[in-house]
Amino acid sequence: MHILVTGFAPFDNQDINPSWEAVTQLEDIIGTHTIDKLKLPTSFKKVDTMINKALASNHYDIVLSIGQAGGRSAITPERVAINIDDARIPDNDDFQPIDQAIHLDGAPAYFSNLPVKAMTQSIINQGLPGALSNSAGTFVCNHVLYHLGYLQDKHYPLLRFGFIHVPYIPEQIDGKSDTPSMTLENIVTGLTAAIEAISDDDDLRIALGTTE
């Protein structure tokens, strides 16, 4: 399959974003998949245009976006995105939407149509912390996952799409001993395992839910 894997530019006054750093280190061929890579701006207003152009100019079977989730200790495939932008901080264009719908004609939520449980289990099988997430937040990461679901719903019915959040890397938490992190090498290993798990097979039926 032909997969577009995206990562984000740094934001919130940081100099690095592990999502893009990891994406750049992915192999161009992973299993049976051919990988293209795209760096997205951390910008509510710009990401839609970049994704639209990428899909218009290439035939991608799958778009998989990678984002930073500082404070998480595991690599977390996302199950669902919700139709709301509610930014705790401004994006890189100093734009801070509050309680705004992403697409007025969109569904309340869109679920990833990738095998998110198989992907999560594949990460865990590498001996790495992995967990299935049921919230992509309400910042640009959720926005991108929702926009991909919207595009699949309205324009690209065969498109498969998903999102994975990754932790900070150690360089980002200097002086913050209580903040979890993961080496870039392990993030790349985990993402590679998740991508290898993508197939046309049905997702695993295993208990990866949460009680809260």
Curated annotation (Swiss-Prot):
Keywords for the protein's UniProt record, in alphabetical order: Cytoplasm, Hydrolase, Protease, Thiol protease
InterPro entries recorded: Peptidase_C15, Peptidase_C15-like, Peptidase_C15-like_sf, PGP-I_bact-type, PGPEP1_Cys_AS, PGPEP1_Glu_AS
EC number of the protein: 3.4.19.3
Example of a GO MF term: pyroglutamyl-peptidase activity
Active site per the UniProt annotation: 78, 141, 165
Tree of life domain: Bacteria
GO cellular component, one term: cytosol
Gene3D superfamilies, sorted: Peptidase C15, pyroglutamyl peptidase I-like
Stored Pfam families: Peptidase_C15 (PF01470)
Entries under PANTHER family matching the protein: PROTEASE FAMILY C15 PYROGLUTAMYL-PEPTIDASE I-RELATED (PTHR23402), PYROGLUTAMYL-PEPTIDASE I (PTHR23402:SF1)
Similarity comment: Belongs to the peptidase C15 family.
Protein name, UniProt field: Pyrrolidone-carboxylate peptidase
